[in-house]
Amino acid sequence: MMNKLYFYCLALFVAPTFSAFGQTQPSQDENGYYLIESAEHLKWFRDQVNASEHEQVDTNGDGQINMDDDTVVRLNAKLTADIDLGGESWTPIGEYNNGEEPDEVRFGGYFDGQGHVIKGLNVQPIDGRQSYGLFGYVAWGVVKNLGIVGGTVTSKADDGQEYTGAISGMLSYGRIENCFSTATVSGTAEGSIGGLTGGMRKISSISNSYNAGTVINPSGMAGGITGYIGSDASVYNCYNMGKVTGGAISGDDYSESTLRSGEEELPSIIDCYYLEGAGSGTLAKALSASDFVTTINEKLFTDPNNGEDFPWDGKANLAGDRLSVPTFDSSSVVEVPLDDDPTATETIAKGESHIQAIDGRICITTSEPMKVRVVNIAGQTVRTVSLSDGYSEMTGLAEGVYIVVLEDGTCVKVLLR
Protein backbone atom coordinates (compact mmCIF):
# COMPACT_ATOMS: atom_id res chain seq x y z
CA MET A 1 0.00 0.00 0.00
CA MET A 2 2.85 2.35 0.84
CA ASN A 3 4.54 1.69 -2.52
CA LYS A 4 1.37 2.43 -4.43
CA LEU A 5 0.89 5.66 -2.54
CA TYR A 6 4.50 6.67 -3.21
CA PHE A 7 4.26 6.16 -6.94
CA TYR A 8 0.93 7.97 -7.08
CA CYS A 9 2.40 11.01 -5.32
CA LEU A 10 5.46 10.93 -7.57
CA ALA A 11 3.22 10.98 -10.61
CA LEU A 12 1.65 14.18 -9.37
CA PHE A 13 5.01 15.92 -9.58
CA VAL A 14 6.35 14.56 -12.87
CA ALA A 15 3.17 14.73 -14.94
CA PRO A 16 2.66 17.85 -17.11
CA THR A 17 0.72 20.63 -15.40
CA PHE A 18 -2.35 22.01 -17.15
CA SER A 19 -4.07 25.28 -16.38
CA ALA A 20 -7.79 25.72 -16.08
CA PHE A 21 -7.62 27.06 -19.64
CA GLY A 22 -6.25 23.82 -21.11
CA GLN A 23 -2.68 24.86 -21.97
CA THR A 24 0.45 23.19 -20.64
CA GLN A 25 2.27 25.12 -17.94
CA PRO A 26 5.90 25.91 -18.84
CA SER A 27 8.72 25.25 -16.41
CA GLN A 28 10.47 28.04 -14.50
CA ASP A 29 14.13 28.90 -14.12
CA GLU A 30 15.88 29.63 -10.82
CA ASN A 31 14.68 33.25 -10.95
CA GLY A 32 11.04 32.37 -11.47
CA TYR A 33 10.90 33.20 -15.20
CA TYR A 34 8.54 30.99 -17.17
CA LEU A 35 10.43 29.35 -20.06
CA ILE A 36 8.25 29.62 -23.17
CA GLU A 37 9.11 27.13 -25.91
CA SER A 38 5.78 26.65 -27.74
CA ALA A 39 2.57 28.39 -28.74
CA GLU A 40 0.75 26.47 -26.00
CA HIS A 41 3.18 27.82 -23.41
CA LEU A 42 2.63 31.37 -24.65
CA LYS A 43 -1.15 30.96 -24.48
CA TRP A 44 -0.82 29.63 -20.95
CA PHE A 45 1.27 32.62 -19.92
CA ARG A 46 -1.24 35.00 -21.55
CA ASP A 47 -4.15 33.42 -19.70
CA GLN A 48 -2.30 33.51 -16.38
CA VAL A 49 -1.57 37.23 -16.74
CA ASN A 50 -5.10 38.09 -17.81
CA ALA A 51 -6.65 36.11 -14.94
CA SER A 52 -4.21 37.13 -12.18
CA GLU A 53 -4.89 39.56 -9.38
CA HIS A 54 -2.97 42.83 -9.47
CA GLU A 55 -0.39 43.37 -6.75
CA GLN A 56 0.91 46.64 -5.43
CA VAL A 57 4.60 47.09 -6.19
CA ASP A 58 7.20 49.76 -5.52
CA THR A 59 6.55 51.80 -8.65
CA ASN A 60 7.70 55.14 -7.22
CA GLY A 61 11.14 53.76 -6.32
CA ASP A 62 11.24 54.71 -2.64
CA GLY A 63 11.89 51.15 -1.47
CA GLN A 64 8.50 50.85 0.22
CA ILE A 65 4.97 49.82 -0.71
CA ASN A 66 2.53 52.64 -0.08
CA MET A 67 -0.67 54.17 -1.41
CA ASP A 68 1.20 56.05 -4.15
CA ASP A 69 2.35 52.83 -5.80
CA ASP A 70 0.48 51.30 -8.72
CA THR A 71 -0.81 47.76 -8.97
CA VAL A 72 0.33 45.44 -11.76
CA VAL A 73 0.48 41.78 -12.72
CA ARG A 74 4.15 40.90 -12.27
CA LEU A 75 4.83 37.59 -14.02
CA ASN A 76 8.07 37.09 -15.95
CA ALA A 77 8.86 35.00 -19.02
CA LYS A 78 11.63 34.16 -21.49
CA LEU A 79 11.32 32.67 -24.94
CA THR A 80 13.57 29.65 -25.41
CA ALA A 81 12.57 29.07 -29.06
CA ASP A 82 10.88 30.80 -31.97
CA ILE A 83 7.08 30.63 -31.62
CA ASP A 84 4.56 30.12 -34.44
CA LEU A 85 1.00 31.06 -33.49
CA GLY A 86 -0.22 29.76 -36.83
CA GLY A 87 -2.57 32.64 -37.57
CA GLU A 88 -4.99 31.61 -34.83
CA SER A 89 -6.93 34.54 -33.39
CA TRP A 90 -4.91 36.00 -30.51
CA THR A 91 -6.26 37.70 -27.40
CA PRO A 92 -3.63 40.22 -26.21
CA ILE A 93 -1.75 39.92 -22.93
CA GLY A 94 -3.14 42.65 -20.69
CA GLU A 95 -5.73 45.28 -21.45
CA TYR A 96 -5.78 49.08 -21.33
CA ASN A 97 -9.04 50.68 -20.22
CA ASN A 98 -8.21 54.29 -19.29
CA GLY A 99 -7.33 53.26 -15.75
CA GLU A 100 -10.74 51.75 -15.05
CA GLU A 101 -10.60 48.60 -12.95
CA PRO A 102 -11.42 45.72 -12.86
CA ASP A 103 -11.44 45.58 -16.68
CA GLU A 104 -7.87 46.86 -16.96
CA VAL A 105 -4.98 44.36 -16.82
CA ARG A 106 -1.53 45.94 -16.46
CA PHE A 107 1.37 43.67 -17.40
CA GLY A 108 4.24 44.78 -15.18
CA GLY A 109 6.66 41.90 -15.58
CA TYR A 110 9.65 41.16 -17.79
CA PHE A 111 9.23 39.45 -21.16
CA ASP A 112 12.60 38.60 -22.70
CA GLY A 113 12.50 37.20 -26.22
CA GLN A 114 16.19 36.27 -25.92
CA GLY A 115 16.62 36.92 -29.65
CA HIS A 116 13.66 34.79 -30.73
CA VAL A 117 10.69 35.74 -32.89
CA ILE A 118 6.94 35.20 -32.87
CA LYS A 119 5.30 34.36 -36.19
CA GLY A 120 1.67 34.05 -37.21
CA LEU A 121 0.31 36.74 -34.86
CA ASN A 122 -3.32 37.47 -35.74
CA VAL A 123 -5.15 40.04 -33.60
CA GLN A 124 -8.66 41.02 -34.68
CA PRO A 125 -11.20 43.51 -33.25
CA ILE A 126 -12.83 42.45 -29.98
CA ASP A 127 -15.98 44.15 -28.70
CA GLY A 128 -15.22 46.56 -25.87
CA ARG A 129 -11.43 46.27 -26.11
CA GLN A 130 -9.28 49.42 -26.40
CA SER A 131 -5.77 47.99 -26.86
CA TYR A 132 -4.40 45.54 -29.41
CA GLY A 133 -1.07 43.79 -29.99
CA LEU A 134 0.86 40.81 -28.68
CA PHE A 135 0.41 42.73 -25.42
CA GLY A 136 -2.63 44.89 -24.88
CA TYR A 137 -1.09 46.91 -22.06
CA VAL A 138 2.46 47.05 -20.71
CA ALA A 139 2.62 49.16 -17.53
CA TRP A 140 5.81 49.20 -15.46
CA GLY A 141 6.88 46.20 -17.53
CA VAL A 142 9.66 45.47 -20.02
CA VAL A 143 9.54 43.71 -23.39
CA LYS A 144 12.95 43.18 -24.98
CA ASN A 145 14.95 41.16 -27.52
CA LEU A 146 11.80 40.15 -29.41
CA GLY A 147 10.79 40.11 -33.07
CA ILE A 148 7.29 39.94 -34.56
CA VAL A 149 7.57 38.39 -38.03
CA GLY A 150 4.63 38.86 -40.38
CA GLY A 151 1.08 38.58 -39.11
CA THR A 152 -1.63 41.20 -38.70
CA VAL A 153 -2.93 43.35 -35.86
CA THR A 154 -6.25 45.05 -36.59
CA SER A 155 -8.56 47.25 -34.52
CA LYS A 156 -11.83 49.01 -35.21
CA ALA A 157 -12.72 51.98 -33.02
CA ASP A 158 -16.49 51.77 -32.72
CA ASP A 159 -16.83 53.12 -29.19
CA GLY A 160 -13.88 55.47 -28.76
CA GLN A 161 -10.09 55.69 -28.86
CA GLU A 162 -8.18 52.47 -29.47
CA TYR A 163 -4.43 51.80 -29.39
CA THR A 164 -2.88 49.26 -31.73
CA GLY A 165 0.69 48.06 -32.26
CA ALA A 166 2.55 44.82 -33.01
CA ILE A 167 4.31 44.63 -29.62
CA SER A 168 1.79 46.47 -27.43
CA GLY A 169 -1.39 48.46 -27.68
CA MET A 170 -0.48 50.85 -24.87
CA LEU A 171 2.86 51.41 -23.12
CA SER A 172 2.85 53.29 -19.80
CA TYR A 173 5.84 53.58 -17.45
CA GLY A 174 7.20 50.63 -19.43
CA ARG A 175 10.02 49.88 -21.87
CA ILE A 176 10.42 48.21 -25.23
CA GLU A 177 14.06 47.45 -26.05
CA ASN A 178 15.84 45.69 -28.94
CA CYS A 179 12.65 44.73 -30.76
CA PHE A 180 11.50 44.69 -34.38
CA SER A 181 8.32 44.03 -36.32
CA THR A 182 7.34 43.22 -39.89
CA ALA A 183 3.63 42.84 -39.07
CA THR A 184 0.84 44.77 -40.76
CA VAL A 185 -0.90 47.00 -38.21
CA SER A 186 -4.13 48.77 -39.11
CA GLY A 187 -6.97 50.72 -37.52
CA THR A 188 -9.56 53.43 -38.05
CA ALA A 189 -9.95 57.18 -37.61
CA GLU A 190 -10.45 57.15 -33.84
CA GLY A 191 -7.43 54.93 -33.22
CA SER A 192 -3.71 55.45 -32.62
CA ILE A 193 -1.79 52.98 -34.75
CA GLY A 194 1.95 52.30 -34.48
CA GLY A 195 4.37 49.74 -35.86
CA LEU A 196 5.57 48.74 -32.38
CA THR A 197 3.07 50.33 -30.00
CA GLY A 198 -0.19 52.17 -30.44
CA GLY A 199 0.38 54.68 -27.65
CA MET A 200 2.97 55.81 -25.10
CA ARG A 201 1.93 57.38 -21.79
CA LYS A 202 3.81 58.76 -18.80
CA ILE A 203 7.51 57.89 -18.50
CA SER A 204 7.65 55.13 -21.10
CA SER A 205 10.39 54.46 -23.65
CA ILE A 206 11.23 52.55 -26.81
CA SER A 207 14.89 52.11 -27.71
CA ASN A 208 17.18 50.32 -30.17
CA SER A 209 14.30 48.99 -32.26
CA TYR A 210 12.88 49.14 -35.78
CA ASN A 211 9.70 48.65 -37.75
CA ALA A 212 9.56 47.25 -41.28
CA GLY A 213 5.86 46.46 -41.32
CA THR A 214 3.02 48.38 -42.93
CA VAL A 215 1.04 50.77 -40.70
CA ILE A 216 -2.42 51.73 -41.97
CA ASN A 217 -4.74 54.39 -40.59
CA PRO A 218 -6.03 56.51 -43.50
CA SER A 219 -7.62 59.28 -41.44
CA GLY A 220 -6.23 58.94 -37.92
CA MET A 221 -2.92 58.82 -36.03
CA ALA A 222 -0.27 56.50 -37.44
CA GLY A 223 3.48 56.17 -36.90
CA GLY A 224 6.18 53.66 -37.75
CA ILE A 225 7.19 53.24 -34.09
CA THR A 226 4.25 54.66 -32.10
CA GLY A 227 0.89 56.10 -33.08
CA TYR A 228 0.68 58.45 -30.09
CA ILE A 229 3.32 59.74 -27.70
CA GLY A 230 2.84 61.64 -24.46
CA SER A 231 5.08 64.48 -23.39
CA ASP A 232 7.02 62.44 -20.81
CA ALA A 233 7.71 59.50 -23.14
CA SER A 234 10.85 58.95 -25.20
CA VAL A 235 11.92 57.12 -28.34
CA TYR A 236 15.65 56.59 -28.76
CA ASN A 237 17.71 55.07 -31.59
CA CYS A 238 14.70 53.74 -33.49
CA TYR A 239 14.15 53.32 -37.22
CA ASN A 240 11.18 52.99 -39.53
CA MET A 241 11.36 51.58 -43.05
CA GLY A 242 7.76 50.39 -43.38
CA LYS A 243 4.97 52.08 -45.31
CA VAL A 244 2.96 54.42 -43.09
CA THR A 245 -0.19 56.34 -43.97
CA GLY A 246 0.91 59.36 -41.90
CA GLY A 247 3.90 60.22 -39.75
CA ALA A 248 7.23 58.41 -39.71
CA ILE A 249 8.34 57.71 -36.14
CA SER A 250 5.41 59.04 -34.07
CA GLY A 251 1.92 59.60 -35.41
CA ASP A 252 0.90 62.29 -32.93
CA ASP A 253 1.90 63.70 -29.57
CA TYR A 254 -0.63 64.92 -27.07
CA SER A 255 1.75 67.55 -25.76
CA GLU A 256 1.13 69.64 -28.89
CA SER A 257 -2.17 70.97 -27.53
CA THR A 258 -0.95 71.52 -23.97
CA LEU A 259 2.18 73.31 -25.15
CA ARG A 260 0.01 76.30 -25.86
CA SER A 261 -0.39 76.86 -22.13
CA GLY A 262 3.24 76.04 -21.39
CA GLU A 263 2.34 73.14 -19.12
CA GLU A 264 4.16 70.40 -21.01
CA GLU A 265 7.34 69.86 -22.97
CA LEU A 266 7.78 67.96 -26.20
CA PRO A 267 8.38 64.22 -25.95
CA SER A 268 11.96 63.08 -26.52
CA ILE A 269 12.61 61.60 -29.96
CA ILE A 270 16.39 61.20 -30.16
CA ASP A 271 18.56 59.60 -32.85
CA CYS A 272 15.52 58.35 -34.74
CA TYR A 273 15.46 57.99 -38.51
CA TYR A 274 13.10 56.91 -41.24
CA LEU A 275 13.54 55.89 -44.83
CA GLU A 276 12.19 58.68 -46.99
CA GLY A 277 12.87 60.71 -50.09
CA ALA A 278 12.19 64.19 -48.72
CA GLY A 279 11.73 65.82 -45.32
CA SER A 280 12.08 68.92 -43.22
CA GLY A 281 13.65 69.89 -39.91
CA THR A 282 11.81 67.60 -37.50
CA LEU A 283 12.53 65.50 -34.42
CA ALA A 284 13.02 62.42 -36.59
CA LYS A 285 15.28 62.71 -39.62
CA ALA A 286 14.50 61.42 -43.10
CA LEU A 287 17.37 59.62 -44.82
CA SER A 288 18.03 58.37 -48.31
CA ALA A 289 18.44 54.61 -48.64
CA SER A 290 22.25 54.76 -48.68
CA ASP A 291 22.44 57.13 -45.70
CA PHE A 292 19.84 55.02 -43.89
CA VAL A 293 22.03 51.91 -44.26
CA THR A 294 25.12 53.75 -43.02
CA THR A 295 23.31 55.22 -40.01
CA ILE A 296 21.46 52.10 -38.91
CA ASN A 297 24.65 50.04 -39.15
CA GLU A 298 26.60 52.53 -37.04
CA LYS A 299 23.97 53.24 -34.42
CA LEU A 300 21.82 50.09 -34.12
CA PHE A 301 23.77 47.14 -35.50
CA THR A 302 27.13 47.95 -33.90
CA ASP A 303 27.56 46.29 -30.51
CA PRO A 304 28.72 48.83 -27.89
CA ASN A 305 29.07 46.30 -25.05
CA ASN A 306 30.95 43.34 -26.56
CA GLY A 307 27.98 41.00 -26.70
CA GLU A 308 26.21 41.83 -23.45
CA ASP A 309 22.46 41.82 -24.14
CA PHE A 310 23.04 42.59 -27.83
CA PRO A 311 20.64 40.50 -29.95
CA TRP A 312 21.29 41.76 -33.50
CA ASP A 313 23.22 39.55 -35.92
CA GLY A 314 24.55 41.18 -39.09
CA LYS A 315 24.49 44.49 -40.92
CA ALA A 316 22.02 46.26 -43.20
CA ASN A 317 22.80 46.15 -46.90
CA LEU A 318 21.59 48.00 -49.99
CA ALA A 319 21.58 46.11 -53.29
CA GLY A 320 19.81 47.68 -56.23
CA ASP A 321 16.23 48.50 -55.26
CA ARG A 322 16.16 46.29 -52.16
CA LEU A 323 17.20 47.07 -48.61
CA SER A 324 18.14 44.08 -46.43
CA VAL A 325 18.03 44.52 -42.66
CA PRO A 326 19.32 41.95 -40.14
CA THR A 327 17.33 40.33 -37.37
CA PHE A 328 18.55 38.15 -34.48
CA ASP A 329 19.60 35.33 -36.83
CA SER A 330 22.16 35.81 -39.61
CA SER A 331 20.25 33.37 -41.80
CA SER A 332 17.08 35.49 -41.62
CA VAL A 333 16.92 39.06 -42.93
CA VAL A 334 14.13 41.55 -43.59
CA GLU A 335 13.98 42.74 -47.19
CA VAL A 336 12.37 46.11 -47.94
CA PRO A 337 11.61 47.00 -51.58
CA LEU A 338 12.46 50.62 -52.29
CA ASP A 339 10.41 53.17 -54.18
CA ASP A 340 10.39 56.95 -54.37
CA ASP A 341 8.77 57.30 -50.96
CA PRO A 342 8.49 54.18 -48.80
CA THR A 343 6.87 55.86 -45.81
CA ALA A 344 3.88 57.52 -47.42
CA THR A 345 1.93 57.37 -50.67
CA GLU A 346 1.01 60.46 -52.64
CA THR A 347 -2.71 60.00 -52.08
CA ILE A 348 -3.28 57.92 -48.99
CA ALA A 349 -7.06 57.86 -49.14
CA LYS A 350 -9.55 59.25 -51.60
CA GLY A 351 -12.39 61.52 -50.55
CA GLU A 352 -14.75 64.16 -51.88
CA SER A 353 -12.28 67.01 -51.35
CA HIS A 354 -9.41 68.40 -53.42
CA ILE A 355 -6.04 69.31 -51.88
CA GLN A 356 -2.93 70.73 -53.51
CA ALA A 357 0.14 72.84 -52.72
CA ILE A 358 0.53 76.12 -54.63
CA ASP A 359 3.31 78.66 -53.97
CA GLY A 360 3.86 77.60 -50.36
CA ARG A 361 0.14 77.43 -49.56
CA ILE A 362 -2.11 74.44 -48.94
CA CYS A 363 -5.22 74.94 -51.07
CA ILE A 364 -8.31 72.92 -50.17
CA THR A 365 -11.71 72.70 -51.84
CA THR A 366 -14.50 70.98 -49.92
CA SER A 367 -18.18 70.43 -50.63
CA GLU A 368 -19.18 70.99 -46.99
CA PRO A 369 -17.72 72.42 -43.76
CA MET A 370 -15.25 70.09 -42.07
CA LYS A 371 -12.23 69.88 -39.80
CA VAL A 372 -8.70 69.52 -41.15
CA ARG A 373 -5.49 68.42 -39.46
CA VAL A 374 -1.99 69.03 -40.86
CA VAL A 375 0.75 66.63 -39.75
CA ASN A 376 4.46 67.05 -40.44
CA ILE A 377 6.53 64.14 -41.69
CA ALA A 378 7.67 63.26 -38.15
CA GLY A 379 4.03 62.74 -37.24
CA GLN A 380 3.41 65.86 -35.16
CA THR A 381 0.17 67.76 -35.62
CA VAL A 382 1.17 71.31 -36.57
CA ARG A 383 -2.24 72.81 -37.29
CA THR A 384 -5.90 71.98 -36.70
CA VAL A 385 -8.66 74.17 -38.16
CA SER A 386 -12.32 74.06 -39.17
CA LEU A 387 -12.99 74.90 -42.81
CA SER A 388 -16.10 76.33 -44.39
CA ASP A 389 -17.35 74.79 -47.61
CA GLY A 390 -15.82 75.91 -50.89
CA TYR A 391 -12.24 77.09 -51.39
CA SER A 392 -9.82 77.67 -48.47
CA GLU A 393 -6.11 78.32 -48.10
CA MET A 394 -3.67 77.54 -45.29
CA THR A 395 -0.57 79.72 -45.07
CA GLY A 396 2.34 80.30 -42.72
CA LEU A 397 3.71 76.74 -42.74
CA ALA A 398 7.44 76.17 -43.17
CA GLU A 399 8.81 74.43 -46.23
CA GLY A 400 8.64 70.66 -46.05
CA VAL A 401 6.45 67.59 -46.47
CA TYR A 402 3.05 67.45 -44.75
CA ILE A 403 0.10 65.07 -44.52
CA VAL A 404 -3.27 66.85 -44.80
CA VAL A 405 -6.08 64.89 -43.12
CA LEU A 406 -9.76 65.81 -43.58
CA GLU A 407 -12.60 64.32 -41.59
CA ASP A 408 -14.26 63.01 -44.77
CA GLY A 409 -11.44 60.48 -45.11
CA THR A 410 -9.25 62.41 -47.53
CA CYS A 411 -5.57 62.13 -46.62
CA VAL A 412 -2.98 63.60 -49.01
CA LYS A 413 0.75 64.27 -48.84
CA VAL A 414 1.86 67.73 -50.03
CA LEU A 415 5.26 69.36 -50.48
CA LEU A 416 5.56 73.06 -49.65
CA ARG A 417 8.49 74.83 -51.31
Q: Residue locations for each model-derived region?
A:
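Surface-exposed repetitive/solenoidal architectures
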Residues: 21-345
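Short beta-strand/loop motifs in extracellular/secreted proteins, especially
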Residues: 368-373
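Short, glycine-anchored, charge-dense loop/turn motifs used at functional sites
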Residues: 375-382, 402
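Bacterial Sec-dependent N-terminal signal peptides
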Residues: 1-24
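Residue-level detector of functionally pivotal "anchor" positions at catalytic/ligand-binding pockets or at interdomain
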Residues: 336-361, 366-367
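Glycine-centered tight-turn motifs at strand-turn-strand junctions
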Residues: 381-397
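Hydrophobic loop/turn residues within beta-sheet-rich immunoglobulin-like superfamily modules
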Residues: 138, 367, 396-398
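C-terminal tail/sorting-segment detector
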Residues: 3, 346-349, 399-417
